[in-house]
Swiss-Prot record:
The gene is ptmE. One of its GO terms (biological process) is alkaloid metabolic process. Aromatic prenyl transferase; part of the gene cluster that mediates the biosynthesis of the indole diterpenes penitrems. The geranylgeranyl diphosphate (GGPP) synthase ptmG catalyzes the first step in penitrem biosynthesis via conversion of farnesyl pyrophosphate and isopentyl pyrophosphate into geranylgeranyl pyrophosphate (GGPP). Condensation of indole-3-glycerol phosphate with GGPP by the prenyl transferase ptmC then forms 3-geranylgeranylindole (3-GGI). This is Aromatic prenyl transferase ptmE. Disulfide bonds: none annotated. Its EC number is 2.5.1.-. Keywords: Transferase. Pathway: Secondary metabolite biosynthesis. It comes from Penicillium ochrochloron.
Length: 425
């Protein structure tokens, strides 16, 4: 009789894979090709085996079912186009590092897509996210889960069926909206003690349908629920800057956490076709409105990171925009904040992954994360062993940087969920 592997030789992912039952081949495919990468990222954060089991089980139960309506771009009859990743996948992974690499955290980004998304039954793909949130509300382990903000903002910033009918009838949506009909996506932070749920909304269609400018729509909806807990002057400074510089557009996102309102931050996201240092500097300082010591120290760190990465500066987005995605930005405001926390997302998609990894390794060492810097390139290769890092250009999608007085340097690296999916790397 041949020898059997000891259970202790198996990883949590391997143990779970032995006994999982899948309701469809599609769900089994997502587990086989995306959960393994997730397991590698969870290990990277120094999670315990118990946490790895917990997070992978959550992925199986509450993330994979969100992709029943996903079809690759080359599949005939595709009814819904997702827009949350440069690759076209409705799934994205990222790892957050702050202060020291021991404080790492995995985040999973998801666009819920039902099998009816884009059809007459669910033309703007609202059904699946409601179904997922209702399911999550029954999970006892999500102790802080709260839907108050979702109920408010989904009504205030997303279209109703009547508004969608009006948009379709008046044909006010440009052809480019074949992808951007999406109005919401989700994020799951795998924290030490529980999973925290985030919501991302795209309010451009609500603004079109209602005839309300985005600046006014966002300000009114935030004041209506937060009242004075989100500092009005701080919010107004950010809103006025974005409005005056034409940064409110079809790519504007709004985000919040599904936790009690008194604890939840808000975030405004956007994209900029000018991937240049001068533009990043302007966004970081909110057009020079904030030049305090903390803001400027963070800017100095950002410049170091910028110079270490193989960034291609563009004053305008090239015609091959899918291959050269724009720079992203975000402003985070927590209850009581007098200064917004900026974040710059440097596009990594279609930059050489070896050069990106080398630049990140050098930066990690500069900020004191020596172990992470020494191991980064090898760990990246171990997650994607079939990819030659010197030739690949799709493993890093975004490199996000922020800095606060409390947390210091805060990095968030976004990755391709799996190299097994059918699109060109």
């Amino acid at each position: 009789m041949g020898s059997l592997s000891s259970p202790t030789d198996l990883t949590p992912y391997q143990v779970l894979s032995k006994y999982k039952k899948f309701p469809s081949p599609d769900e089994e495919f997502w587990w086989d090709h995306a959960a393994s990468t997730l397991a590698d990222l969870i290990k990277w954060t120094k999670a315990t085996p118990a946490q790895e089991y917990e997070f992978l089980q959550f992925f199986y139960e509450h993330v994979i079912p969100n992709f029943s309506g996903y079809r690759p771009y080359d599949v005939p009859g595709r009814a819904w186009n997702t827009g949350i990743t440069p690759s076209g996948l409705p799934l994205e992974y990222s790892v957050n590092w702050r202060n020291i690499d021991a404080n790492a955290m995995v985040r999973v980004g998801v666009e819920p897509i039902s099998q009816f998304a884009g059809t007459a039954r669910d033309p703007y793909s609202h059904y699946k996210i409601w179904d997922t949130l209702n399911q999550l509300s029954q999970v006892k382990a999500l102790k802080s889960f709260d839907l108050e903000l979702w109920r408010h903002f989904s009504s205030a910033l997303c279209t109703s069926r009547e508004e969608e009918a009006l948009l379709d009838q008046t044909r006010t949506l440009p052809e480019s909206f074949s992808i951007a009909k999406m109005q919401h996506s989700m994020g799951f932070d795998f924290c030490d003690d529980e999973v925290v749920v985030k919501i991302y909304l795209i309010p451009n269609m609500k603004a079109r349908a209602s005839g309300t400018p985005l600046a006014e729509l966002l300000t009114g909806s935030i004041h209506a629920i937060y009242r004075d807990t989100i500092d009005r002057e701080t919010l107004a400074t950010v809103i006025n800057y974005l409005d005056s510089t034409s940064n409110f557009n079809d790519a504007t996102w709004f985000s919040f956490d599904c936790i009690p309102r008194s604890q939840s931050r808000i975030k405004l996201y956007g994209s900029d076709f000018r991937t240049t240092w001068s533009r990043a500097e302007d966004l970081w300082t909110v057009g020079g409105r904030y030049t305090d010591a903390v803001t400027m120290k963070g800017l100095a760190y950002l410049k170091e990171l910028w110079d270490l990465l193989p960034i291609q500066d563009f004053e305008t987005l090239p015609e091959q925009a899918v291959q050269n995605p724009p720079m992203l930005w975000a402003y985070e405001i927590r209850p009581g904040d007098k200064i917004p926390s900026p974040r710059i997302y440097i596009p990594g998609h279609c930059l050489n992954d070896k050069k990106v990894a080398d630049g990140l390794s050098a930066f990690f060492k500069r900020v004191g994360w020596s172990d992470l810097g020494d191991q980064y390139t090898d760990r990246l290769f171990s997650m994607f062993p079939k990819q030659d890092l010197k030739d690949s250009t799709a493993l890093h999608t975004w490199i996000a940087f922020s800095y606060t007085e409390k947390s210091g340097v805060y990095m968030n690296c976004y990755y391709l969920a799996s190299a097994s999916f059918p699109f060109k790397l």
